[in-house]
Amino acid sequence: MSMLLNLYRKALNLPLSLLVKTRSIPTDPVNELGLKLDQPIVYVLPYTSQTDLLILQKNCQALNLPDPLVNNDIQGVSLSRFVFLDEGRRFFKSKGAKSETELVFYRYLDLNRNDEQLDIQVVPVSVLWGRAPGKEKGLPVLRLLGTFQRLVTMLWFGRDNFIRFSQAVSLRYMITNHGTDENLAQKLARVAKMHFAKQRYSATGPQLPDRQAMFNKLLQSPAILAAIEDEAKKPKSSLEKARKEAEKILDEIAANVRHDSLRSADRVLSWLWNKLYQGINVQYAERVRKLALEGHELVYVPCHRSHMDYLLLSYILYHQGLVPPHIAAGINLNFWPAGPIFRSWGAFFIRRTFKGNRLYSTIFREYLAELFYRGYSVEYFIEGGRSRTGRLLDPKTGMMSMTLQALQRGLTRPISIVPVYIGYEHVLEVDTYAKELRGAEKEKENAGLVLRVIKKLKKLGQGYVNFGEPIPLNHYLNQYFPEWKEPLTDENGRPKWLNSAVEAVSKQVMVHINNAVAVNAKNLIGSVLLASRQRSLTREQLIEQVESYMQLFKNVPYTAEVTLPTDTAEAMLDHVINLPRSGVISEKDNFGEIIRLDRQSAVLMTYYRNNIQHLFVLPSLVASIVLHHETVSKDLIIQSVNRIYPFLQAELFMHFKAEEVRGHIEAILAEFVAQNLIKNESDMFVINRQRIRSLQLHSSGVRELLQRYYISLSILIEQPEISRNELEQESRSIAQRLSVLHGINAPEFFDKALFSTFSATLKEQGYFDEEGDTIVSKVQSTEELIRGLISVEIQHTVQGAMVKLEEVNNI
């Protein structure tokens, strides 16, 4: 039998090598799952399948994992390195496979008991052939296939094949916690079976809905029936017209997911990413897979940089063994032919505004709740639109409000919000963003626009997807809003806790996105060049500054989740110079090499700098304070930072709590001393004039933010009775003038939303009394602090502009 089995395996290898291309999840199981290669590994497969076993062997060889067909030799005992949990329907099946598996587990457990240094790792492995969940009116497509069935299946699903390595189970841990349990081997097998069942569901998801049946159910819901009746009361309306309008709205909104479309999309997108980018880097996907296995309802909330985000995240999730979500897409993307295609890939469409339209808002809310009820993962962009500046935008809370309301209605599964950072070394629409910021009208999406974008397709560097720390909503609400389960409502019938909870969760999502940013060659090199007033440095200066930033990010991490490039500073610079349309130019003269950023590309580069600006504003602020004083105490530095930090925190969604700032500033100071940028003499921090150029470059990261704050504070001192709206308008006018006169490239410098955030933070920080009047003394104190950190030229321009504004207002 053994010889026949070996011949059978050899015969199988030929069609496998020709027809099957397997993707490993995760791509690096040794590091991502923390496998210990110096300890024995036992692979557990769910069903007897020689095909799956050979696929496992091939992938183990590629991933530097032990060969499953080579036995483990432990203490002179040779045991199989793989086991099957169940027989299945097979030609070459192991008689009594289940009892054989338990026997192998018993023998491994005995070996572990006899050697305290031994820690055998049991690794569940499953091979997926196709991921279709099936339709509600049909049979599940993903079946447990027999040997000959799989040979046929190779032709159809050979390129849609995944192998999933799961977290290892430590037999040492099992013995420590259940050492005297005689049924431990049976328990281990039973737990593994349950794991595989959950894993299959997490990979395929619930059955796809029958669209018309879903519509019929929703149209009979009490909330929608009430909204239809309300609509029918309007002039020139009737119950029949209102119902037809409701059906039309549902058809406009609802997705129409088809698995064959998702498979086609996978092939198209694989081609697209290979053509567009040199690689897509994914981090922290395991935390999401864990939540899916635990049965959580997943709501993906990414930042929004590009229309590519819709496609990229679904593609990444599919390749991470997760179900692509239903995606809330703007109605502007519902144009032919893209609309029907996106709809078949999971997009459901939302109007930009539907305030006052009760019928539409009710139908949309009920549709979203139905998606949650059926167990579909959902994705929406909380910023509401694509960021034109590269910064996170203030969250639009409508979708989050509907999510929390759906949870309160009594979902059986817990909901977890998954913040996602998406970044690119080149955003396709960045040129368009620059034009829009200069006043051009936004071009409406259409097929012609898509074709023009496709023409630009070429190597655009790297893409980045980092999954931030999830927010389990049930746990979060229990901790911070324990009244959320109570049926208390306000005068509008909304839960009293809802608005505060929605605001808090939304801001927490933004903080978690920024906690998981990806530093890359382009945003780092761009940040250094933009720090120089002339946007140019010698190659040596630039390399030195990049290395300084990298040391700072490693030794004083913003969070443990921020990902850093692994290349040297030299390699990063060469990479950016060679990127198409990066604007970074290398020139040589008699004295050496100069790296400069051309003028036209400066505004575009600020977009990429803004992706990571929050990482270096506190080091920049510390550098600015030390440069201003030249010799300064630690307490004065911390006191100054504490005064300014609330404004930075509100604008950049920074995670440090007030009590955590001091420790972080002390770590920054210690790092600056270690890098010899400053000296610590008799408890005073002193600038090191030999490294002053590097310290000046560090200080520039916060320069434009302080200039904006100075504008608003100066206006408040001159006009303490000014309204908040007028303060924002006048601040913006002066910022525009400052931008022109001083060549400030940052597109967000005169963004109205940032001045609005600043004035709101002034109110939160007690710069106005209960009547709303300005507390001038507090404003003056902060203005004096900030004035010392910006140049005299900027001060003069601001004061001159204020005089001009006053003259205009008096006319």
UniProtKB/Swiss-Prot annotation:
Motif interval(s): HXXXXD motif: 303-308
Topology in the lipid bilayer: Peripheral membrane protein
Database matches in SUPFAM superfamilies: Glycerol-3-phosphate (1)-acyltransferase
Keyword Transcription part of the UniProt annotation: no
Alphabetic keyword roster: Acyltransferase, Cell inner membrane, Cell membrane, Lipid biosynthesis, Lipid metabolism, Membrane, Phospholipid biosynthesis, Phospholipid metabolism, Transferase
Gene Ontology molecular function: glycerol-3-phosphate O-acyltransferase activity
UniProt-listed Enzyme Commission number(s): 2.3.1.15
Annotated GO CC locations: plasma membrane
Catalytic activity: sn-glycerol 3-phosphate + an acyl-CoA = a 1-acyl-sn-glycero-3-phosphate + CoA
Location(s) in or outside the cell: Cell inner membrane
BP term (GO), one: fatty acid metabolic process
InterPro entries: GPAT/DHAPAT, GPAT/DHAPAT_C, GPAT/DHAPAT_LPLAT, GPAT_PlsB, Plipid/glycerol_acylTrfase
Pathway(s) served: Phospholipid metabolism; CDP-diacylglycerol biosynthesis; CDP-diacylglycerol from sn-glycerol 3-phosphate: step 1/3
Domain notes: The HXXXXD motif is essential for acyltransferase activity and may constitute the binding site for the phosphate moiety of the glycerol-3-phosphate.
NCBIfam families, sorted: plsB, PRK04974.1
Record family assignment: Belongs to the GPAT/DAPAT family.
HAMAP family: Glyc3P_acyltrans
Name the UniProt record assigns to this protein: Glycerol-3-phosphate acyltransferase
Encoding gene per record: plsB
